[in-house]
């Protein structure tokens, strides 16, 4: 079943990106430059993104921030996000996200997640874990580069942890992302900022993070040597605030990456991040790969 899910996802993405390539044509400004996450779509446009994140760690920090070695743990997340515009004024978009995860623990190598095994007694779990209907809108008409994306994450798993192997949070999450971008007059530099908030609610016994609030600001600085290519640096911070469940943590990550416009409609990205500090958290690194198609 797990292979059918991934093959179906891969086949869907290939069909989308093939269709996008067929629509390829020259453009003055690439979608990579024009459509930052803060931009909204007009009616009939589609934004389809397939993003893959591999997090692996061999070190962690306790509540005081003291670091120590750990047995390697690996967490792979593959997400498919689909959005479309519903009016000509580009003020509201609607979308749906789905996540697939594959995790391994107890010293298994980082690439073990790509075996997509679901055997908790052998330190591995995998499966489709959540879906999230979303809405994205511009709250201030005069500031089109400031948008808010609100999503409601619905868990699809019965157990958060089995035989010590964590798969995903078993709780409902209300997520709000605040996006803003600024482009320099030279159009070679772009600054993108976001604040991501996640409120987890439900019974404390159902999820470790229920009844808590996560706040994650981030800043991305991109340099465009040309319209079809950009390199970027980023800084992100995450703070989980315990409301009634008694669990809190935080971390800071820095990273760099690149994006390239393959065709008029399709671009891909590679990003690396390193967790440089934290409290009661892992101190690992992430390797990220994404494909994005913008269709008229």
Where in this protein do the model-derived segments appear?
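Bacterial Sec-dependent N-terminal signal peptides
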Residues: 1-22
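Transmembrane beta-barrel domains of Gram-negative outer membranes and organellar outer membranes
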Residues: 21-157, 164-200, 214-296
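Active-site-adjacent structural elements in folded domains
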Residues: 203-205
């Amino acid at each position: 079943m797990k292979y059918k899910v991934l093959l179906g996802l891969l086949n869907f993405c290939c069909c989308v990106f093939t269709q996008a390539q067929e629509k390829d044509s020259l453009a003055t400004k690439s979608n990579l430059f024009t459509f930052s996450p803060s931009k909204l779509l007009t009616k009939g446009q589609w934004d389809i993104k397939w993003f893959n994140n591999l997090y692996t760690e061999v070190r962690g920090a306790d509540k005081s921030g003291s670091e120590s070695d750990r047995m390697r743990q690996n967490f792979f997340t593959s997400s498919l996000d689909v959005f479309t515009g519903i009016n000509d004024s580009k003020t509201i978009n609607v979308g749906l996200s789905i996540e697939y995860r594959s995790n391994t623990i107890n010293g298994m190598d980082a690439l073990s997640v790509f075996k997509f095994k679901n055997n908790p007694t052998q330190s591995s779990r995998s499966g489709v874990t959540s879906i999230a209907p979303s809405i994205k809108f511009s709250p201030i008409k005069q500031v089109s580069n400031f948008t808010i994306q609100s999503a409601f994450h619905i868990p699809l798993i019965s157990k958060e942890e089995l035989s010590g192997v964590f798969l995903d949070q078993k709780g409902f999450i209300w997520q709000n992302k605040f996006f803003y971008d600024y482009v320099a007059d030279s159009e070679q530099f772009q600054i993108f900022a976001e604040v991501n908030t996640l409120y987890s609610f439900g019974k404390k016994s159902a999820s470790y993070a229920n009844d808590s609030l996560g706040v994650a600001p981030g800043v991305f600085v991109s340099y465009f040597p040309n319209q079809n290519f950009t390199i970027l640096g980023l800084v992100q911070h995450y703070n989980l605030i315990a409301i009634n469940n008694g669990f809190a943590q935080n971390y800071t990550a820095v990273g760099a990456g690149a994006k390239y416009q393959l065709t008029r409609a399709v671009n891909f990205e590679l990003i690396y991040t390193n967790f440089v500090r934290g409290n009661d958290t892992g101190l690992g690194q992430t390797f990220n790969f994404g494909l994005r198609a913008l269709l008229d």
